[in-house]
């Protein structure tokens, strides 16, 4: 336990470890403890604090540092408070202890995804306020629930509420991903999650007979069509040295059907997780799914469990004032950026769909990707470097001059 209370530990690291100890783990996150923690941070930093309960027990906490020119749109810094479940037996240390080893690695669920970023936002604001800075644009920090289970009772609802509109967000930052290289990963868009169930109906009967037109035979044809598409996209990814977010992925995740070994089922189903690349014509792709089902035979249908249609791409053109401010910080700090499409889904998709350009960025280079993994961890030096980077980013973004639409 020597890692606790170590003399000389940076206060930002201590705060980070404290936040990691709050058990906001799905499926029963302690959101109340997280909100209380954030309220105390607001009190200490002299920030405005608003709590918006989007559904009972699911609170979006908004901390606000007012700018000097309220006519300008604001900067939105978003992070989620929940974390994914753990298999404690596979961890070297308690995932909710906030343990720091002798080498400076901080272990905990949320160390990379994304409690580190939440504290980096807060500590960057604290540093700027202590130094006496004031900026034209207001900075809002939103801490939202439910992201790890889709954001359906979090950001998806929040962006539809008047409290979100009142923030008048002009530009947003959300989570990114660790990078094992020298470059920092920046997400400017993300793939659309399509979860669907294919259901096949056919003739039932005794398991000893060669029955024609069975549900299994027809479902097999659809599965083959989809997995052939998967292989094609996999080859495109590998042969063209693309990033995962640039192609469409699909995985067969569930198979259901049957009641007994000797009964041919009348119905069988297969579930698929598609992540559709931003450049895909979504209407045409849905028609392709329909054609695969029709080609399999009569009685084959599909239904969506999740279907995201609001694909948005945030500008990374040098003429864009937000991107110019963001990328300019990295040029000044002589840090490399690597632009990517997020291969998974984050709350940034809801923000972009609400008309607010957003980038996904977590300042973790030279760091293995360990989100959702056993022994999720982050080195304290990388974490503190991230506070430095956010300090510069907030200063630049909150100082972007009035846009033509704001004049």
From Swiss-Prot:
Binds 2 Zn(2+) ions per subunit. Its EC number is 3.5.1.14. It catalyses: an N-acyl-L-amino acid + H2O = an L-alpha-amino acid + a carboxylate; N-acetyl-L-methionine + H2O = L-methionine + acetate; N-acetyl-L-glutamine + H2O = L-glutamine + acetate. It is an enzyme of class 3 (hydrolase). Keywords: Acetylation, Cytoplasm, Hydrolase, Metal-binding, Zinc. Signal peptide: none annotated. It is found in: Cytoplasm. The keyword Chaperone does not apply. Zn(2+) 2 binds at residues 113, 148, 372. InterPro entries: Aminoacylase-1_M20A, ArgE/DapE_CS, Bact_exopeptidase_dim_dom, N-acyl_aa_amidohydrolase, Peptidase_M20, Peptidase_M20_dimer. Its main location: cytoplasm. Belongs to the peptidase M20A family. Homodimer. Interacts with SPHK1. Catalyzes the hydrolysis of N-acetylated amino acids to acetate and free amino acids. This is Aminoacylase-1. The lineage of its organism: Eukaryota, Metazoa, Chordata, Craniata, Vertebrata. The gene is ACY1.
